[in-house]
Amino acid sequence: MFLIKKRYFFSVIFLIPFYLSADTYSVNDKLYFGIGAGIISPNDVEIKTTTAQTANNVAFSANIDGEFEFDNGYQITGLIGYRLSDSLSFESEIGYSMFDYDKLNLTVGGTATSGGVTFTGGANSSHVVDGSISAFSMVFGPSFDFDFNRKVELVLGGGIGFASYSDEIKSVGNSTGLSYDEDQTDFAAKLKGGLNYSLDSKSFIQGDYGFNFVDSSIDNYTSDFTAHTFNAKFVINF
């Protein structure tokens, strides 16, 4: 799937610990919920064609080489976790991400044709892209926590799941020759690390960084989608 279509998205979070030997929160309360928001920073997506082909209903010429760049966007997340022990939890995180395309940078130029209109990009050229990607994601996996003191914990986790995204390009360089609107669902994975700060025995704030992957590549066209996320969440135990 057009890597750049990855709405990824992706992105999605899923970590949270529990009381180790400190009173960060009560280990008797095994179930916890969280909600948060943050920033998603997508990496560039490579576009490369060795032969002429059609992808996303757009006909591309052979030997195109370049990359799509994206603006930073926002992410809203929800978290449900269950403590298996004092230092191990299993979590499910859902997320909604939204970000815009920035530009298409071409090292080797070529053409793209859609709806009877042809976009032509020269070698070593850059073109403004009017488009966006939005994604819903869900990831499941373990989370480990390590106490620093009675208030602060280090959290490490990861998981696998899916990203369902909508990828739309309206125009490139004021031409609709490379325009499309596609919906895809792909495998997604995430690695995360962060800190928990206890507010009381029932709640805490979590700040974390995540590296997100979406298996969205298209053979002879685009690479997979990856992105960095930075989030803050409020979590409460039940």
Predicted regions span which residues?
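Short, contiguous, well-ordered secondary-structure segments
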Residues: S21-G34, I133-G159, Y209-F213
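Short glycine/proline- and aromatic-enriched beta-strand/turn motifs that initiate or cap beta-hairpins
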Residues: A22-G81, V235-N237
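Repeated loop/turn-to-beta-strand initiation elements of outer-membrane beta-barrel proteins
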Residues: L31, S87-F90, K151-V152, Y197-I205
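Residues on the lipid-exposed face of transmembrane beta-strands in outer-membrane beta-barrel proteins
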Residues: I35-I39, G78-Y82, M138-F144, G158-F162, ...
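Outer-membrane beta-barrel transmembrane strands
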Residues: F68-R83, S87-E93, G131-S143
